[in-house]
Amino acid sequence: MELGLTGKRVLVTAASKGLGRAVAEALLAEGCRVCISSSSSDRINAAAREMASGGGEVHAIAADIAVAEDCARLFDWAVRTLGGLDILVNNTGGPPAGNVLEVNEAQWNHAFESILMSAVRLSRAAIPVMRQGGGGAIVNLASLAGKQPIDGIALSNAFRPALIGMAKTLSREAAPEVRVNNIATEHILTDRIRDIAGRIWRRDDESVEETIERKSREVPLGRYGTAQELANAVVFLCSDAASYITGVTLAVDGGLDRGLF
């Protein structure tokens, strides 16, 4: 299947590790020209060096996407560096685990800015540029928490649905030139999941690995997914193979979501 991604100009946020990095690496492997960002200069530059060592064009910048000025600076830099933009992948690290009564107001405000407003700002900036270049694709990395609350992650439960709702609305406004879709992930084994397993889900008599094994039995496919499997879904939604798909939220969760839609 021809994906039509060679030479596409890409920006992936929160890409120094975890899901964001896996997505950036997968798009790089398809021949895309990739810009990546993270709040940590050391981490994002190290990631760029490692990714570039395998071949391909990758550029890095430090930016805090929870800050409006950094979003603007990041976007302007990416467009200057690549000469335009064809694909935007909105990803956010975190937010911290915790229940509604535990999370403080500063954390609520930061999650609002980083999860929702970063995607709003970058998408609003990207669509005119993509239209000028003949079209494009935006993919937001959301969570199954956007469809059904998950114990212990109140911030995701609150703001991932808002992200999905914004993107669904935007998909109609941006059409036909720009497609906008979401990925709803859950039970993808990352450092964040290990942290949540250890601090929120673990029973007193369990190790973290035993907790992960127990939680994996909740998944119809019987295991946690990998970051690469998530990245494959993002690549598909960015590609010509998904040219008639917009406004969808694709669950990459091993069948964990019980919903009909």
Per-range role (PLM):
Residues R9, A14-G18:
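Conserved glycine-rich cofactor-binding loop
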Residues C71, N99-V100, N104-F112, I138, ...:
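Substrate-binding pocket helix/loop in short-chain dehydrogenase/reductase
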Residues V103, P149-N157, T169:
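Active-site loop-to-helix junction immediately N-terminal to the catalytic Tyr of the SDR YXXXK motif
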Residues S123, F159-R160, A167:
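Active-site helix of classical SDR
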Residues P128, R172-P176, S243:
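Alpha-helical segment proximal to the catalytic Tyr-Lys
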Residues S143:
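Residue(s) in the substrate-gating loop at a strand-loop-helix junction
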Residues Q148, V235, T246-F261:
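Short C-terminal tail/terminal secondary-structure segment
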